[in-house]
From Swiss-Prot:
A Pfam cross-reference name: Nic96
Phosphothreonine, modified sites: 49
Quaternary assembly: Part of the nuclear pore complex (NPC). Component of the p62 complex, a complex composed of NUP62 and NUP54. Forms a complex with NUP35, NUP155, NUP205 and lamin B; the interaction with NUP35 is direct. Does not interact with TPR. Interacts with SMAD4 and IPO7; translocates SMAD4 to the nucleus through the NPC upon BMP7 stimulation resulting in activation of SMAD4 signaling.
Residue list for modification Phosphoserine: 52, 66, 72, 75, 80, 430, 767
Gene Ontology biological process terms, A to Z: nuclear envelope organization; nuclear pore complex assembly; poly(A)+ mRNA export from nucleus; positive regulation of SMAD protein signal transduction; protein import into nucleus
Membrane topology: Peripheral membrane protein
Primary subcellular site in the record, as a coarse category: nucleus
Keywords: Membrane, mRNA transport, Nuclear pore complex, Nucleus, Phosphoprotein, Protein transport, Translocation, Transport
Record protein name field: Nuclear pore complex protein Nup93
Sequence similarity: Belongs to the nucleoporin interacting component (NIC) family.
Localization: Nucleus membrane; Nucleus, Nuclear pore complex; Nucleus envelope
Function comment: Plays a role in the nuclear pore complex (NPC) assembly and/or maintenance. May anchor nucleoporins, but not NUP153 and TPR, to the NPC. During renal development, regulates podocyte migration and proliferation through SMAD4 signaling.
Length: 819
């Protein structure tokens, strides 16, 4: 049987093959075993895929069917959904179809409004995002700029170089971040501000700061002497610093003050030298500069130098005596030498008398030209360096010659060049006979620069060079870069700022030292606000009182947004240090405010406190912000923030020292005080606050197991309906509740349903024989509880608020258990 079947099958196969070969014009292809296997596997996998899909559909139907879902019904509903009515274009209508035309116009208007609203919403979102990014980027830029103390390449120079100590060692470690010198400066700033705040005459800040130098070394003392000398100039009142600093009169005064300082310093140096070598100096005669210089030359020039001309006076070269008398700032003593040697000096006596008697130490143009002509013809290559130097000073000529044989020290070079500086342009001077202050400033700051003066070994020398040439901002910025000298630089800047001599940057994003368009070429500006904030950053967290004293100098400064810098710095200081009570004051139990440190600086503290509170609120410090708004008597903001704080903790279980317990006590204290003092806020915010407090009481009773008391509270609050007649009313009232109340609705519903369920179980657990109430009363109560549970389910389904699926499931479950 089987053999016949296989034989028949073979016969049919051969017949089929023969027919195929007969009708096909294509060449015959024979598959090997491997190809046959691959083809079979492909057919098998195709069959399995179809089978597995059917199996998956069956499994899905079984799974969803066990949960009461009909998968075929769901598929039909999904297939029946159509987006044609929403997204397909409107069908064209005939011109005479008025109804169709109106319908299309209405639909077009709706679609246009939706599209316009969508575009506007996206545009607003983009704009808000862009503004937020710009604000954040501005803050990042400020932080980056504040970390860079200097401009240019120096800001990125991280090489470690040893610095000599110019201040006393830091005292024993303590709470303060200030060392003894910085603390001494801070005390002087406190004294200065106290006088200003109390309306007294403005004290001399230079003298106050200079008194700190007594605790330090001679370099600091000399620095403050120089600052005092250079700032003792007469300024035009009611003009800005740039106009004052640019005026010829003030610039001439700066040069005069610098010369006076250099001359007095050199005279002190000669005194020290002479009294240190009394035997060699042979000091005697009438006390005065002439005898001092004569004795000084006994030490400096013990033997006559070759090339000196025009004889001697009392054994010393004439021109050396004249030069050193002038170097000490005593023209009368120099005139005494000139008179003694007048026969050897020719016309020089006449020229010197005119120079000495002129107001600005300046010869008349005719005399000056005559002297310069004589210098070029006879003295340019003279072998007496002192004679050449004196002629160059009096005639202000040959400014390219540095007179290095005589002016071998930096101070001597400065004195010589400042004597040659001219301010009037008569047009007759050649370039080699003309040196302006701007040219000299540029030469020192840009051409020579820091590398020429070995600033790491002698920082005060370069500071002196810049300061004496009226480049105050560059001098301060240079000194500020050195950690050990930073405090001195800051207080020099404060002195200049108070005297209206400091050129400040117009924007806070500028570098510490910058040049602004429109300023004279050699004018630099200092970012004073940034300088002060960088300095106070070191100690503002540990010494907020001292930092506040420095911030008071910024009371008239504005930032790029027009915000008062004092307010801004105080707010950042309070947030950073968390010294709210000490700085801003404290609220007593009776509602009165205990003054803080800020009260010394202003009688109206509300703007400052409100500003700090606003910053705290923006940083998410709602609890601190609420306390600050309370301090500023801003009841609306207090309750608004308290509502935000209370809402998340309302349903939590109270525990000692918990977050909820702390906030609850704070809220109760505010509520008691507001009610006692009759303080009220916005009605909506006010009602939300007291409702949240009532809900906290409700949940406390509920968690404590006092379900009857909790039920009485929720019944009095009328937040949820407990009978079918009040459902509509409660749903309508729910629309008026704030989000802080709505967010707690799920927990309120669950707690209320739990209370009803507990009462129901308690009622069911009471046997008729043991109960003192009649059976009828028990049945009525049973019916009432079921009705109330049903009412809660109805209310939960009707309110326009999406509760969680878990909440709905639990509510339904308990309601079902009660039925």
């Amino acid at each position: 049987m089987d053999t016949e079947g296989f034989g028949e099958l073979l016969q049919q196969a051969e017949q089929l093959a023969a027919e195929t070969e007969g009708i096909s014009e294509l060449p015959h292809v024979e598959r090997n075993l491997q190809e046959i296997q691959q083809a079979g596997e492909r057919l098998c996998s195709r069959t399995l895929t179809r089978t597995s899909q059917e199996t998956a559909d069956v499994k899905a139907s079984v799974l969803l069917g066990s949960r009461g879902l009909d998968i075929s019904h769901i598929s039909q509903r999904l297939e029946s959904l159509s987006a044609a009515t929403t997204f397909e274009p409107l069908e064209p209508v005939k011109d005479t179809d008025i109804q169709g035309f109106l319908k299309n116009e209405k639909d077009n208007a709706l679609l246009s409004a939706i599209e316009e609203s969508r575009k506007r919403t996206f545009g607003m979102a983009e704009e808000y995002h862009r503004e937020s990014m710009l604000v954040e980027w501005e803050q990042v830029k400020q932080r980056i700029l504040h970390t860079l103390l200097a401009s240019g390449e120096d800001a990125l120079d991280f090489t470690q170089e040893s610095e000599p100590s110019y201040i006393s060692d830091v005292g024993p470690p303590g709470r303060s971040s200030l060392d003894n010198i910085e603390m001494a400066y801070a005390r002087q700033i406190y004294i200065y501000n106290e006088k200003i705040v109390n309306g007294h005459l403005q004290p001399n800040l230079v003298d106050l700061c200079a008194s700190v130098a007594e605790l330090d070394d001679k370099s600091i003392s000399d620095m403050w002497t120089m600052v005092k000398q250079m700032t003792d100039v007469l300024l035009t009142p009611a003009t800005d610093a740039l106009k004052n600093r640019s005026s010829v009169e003030v610039r001439m005064e700066f040069v005069r003050q610098a010369l006076a300082y250099l001359e007095q310093s050199y005279k002190n140096y000669t005194l020290v030298t002479v009294f240190g070598n009394l035997h060699q100096a042979q000091l005697g005669g009438v006390p005065g500069t002439y005898q001092l210089v004569r004795s000084f030359l006994n030490i400096k020039l013990p033997a006559p130098l070759p090339g000196l001309q025009d004889g001697e006076v009392e054994g010393h070269p004439v021109w050396a005596l004249i030069y050193y008398c002038m170097r000490c700032g005593d023209l009368l003593a120099a005139s005494q030498v000139v008179n003694r040697a007048q026969h050897q000096l020719g016309e020089f006596k006449t020229w010197f008398q005119e120079y000495m008697n002129s107001k600005d130490r300046r010869l008349s143009p005719a005399t000056e030209n005559k002297l310069r002509l004589h210098y070029r013809r006879a003295l340019r290559n003279n072998t007496d360096p002192y004679k050449r130097a004196v002629y160059c000073i009096i005639g202000r000529c040959d400014v390219t010659d540095n007179q290095s044989e005589v002016a071998d020290k930096t101070e001597d070079y400065l004195w010589l060049k400042l004597n040659q500086v001219c301010f009037d342009d008569d047009g007759t001077s050649s370039p080699q006979d003309r040196l302006t202050l701007s040219q000299f400033q540029k030469q020192l700051l840009e051409d020579y620069g820091e590398s020429h003066f070995t600033v790491n070994q002698q920082p005060f020398l370069y500071f002196q060079v810049l300061f004496l040439t009226a480049q105050f901002e560059a001098a301060i910025a240079f000194l500020f870069r050195m950690e050990r000298l930073r405090c001195h630089a800051v207080h020099v800047a404060l002195v200049l700022f108070e005297l209206k001599l400091l050129l400040k940057s117009s924007g806070q994003s500028a570098q510490l030292l910058s040049h602004e368009p429109g300023d004279p070429p050699c004018m630099r500006r200092l970012n004073f606000v940034r300088l002060l904030m960088l300095y106070t950053r070191k100690f503002e967290s540990t010494d907020p009182r001292e930092a506040l004293q420095y911030f008071y100098f910024l009371r008239d400064e504005k930032d790029s947004q027009g915000e008062n810098m004092f307010l801004r710095c105080v707010s950042e200081l309070v947030i950073e240090s968390r010294e709210f009570d000490m700085i801003l004051g404290k609220l007593e139990n009776d509602g009165s405010r205990k003054p803080g440190v800020i009260d010394k600086f202003t009688s109206d503290t509300k703007p400052i406190i409100n500003k700090v509170a606003s910053v705290a609120e923006n940083k998410g410090l709602f609890e601190e912000a609420a306390k600050l708004y309370d301090l500023a008597k801003n009841a609306d903001k207090v309750l608004e923030l308290m509502n935000k704080l209370l809402s998340p903790v309302v349903p939590q279980i109270s525990a000692p020292q918990s977050n909820k317990e702390r906030l609850k006590n704070m809220a109760l204290s505010i509520a008691e005080r507001y009610r006692a003092q009759g303080i009220s806020a916005n009605k909506f915010v006010d009602s939300t606050f007291y409702l949240l407090l009532d809900l906290i009481t409700f949940f406390d009773e509920y968690h404590s197991g006092h379900i009857d008391r909790a039920f009485d509270i929720i019944e009095r609050l009328k937040l949820v309906p407990l009978n079918q007649e009040s459902v509509e009313e409660r749903v309508a009232a729910f629309r008026n509740f704030s989000d802080e109340i709505r967010h707690n609705l799920s927990e309120v519903l669950l707690a209320t349903m739990n209370i009803l369920f507990t009462q129901f179980k308690r009622l069911k657990g009471t046997s008729p024989s043991s109960s003192s109430r009649p059976q009828r009363v028990i049945e009525d109560r049973d019916s009432q509880l079921r009705s109330q549970a049903c009412t809660l389910i109805t209310f939960a389904g009707m309110i326009p608020y999406r509760t969680s699926g878990d909440t709905n499931a639990r509510l339904v479950q308990m309601e079902v258990l009660m039925n």
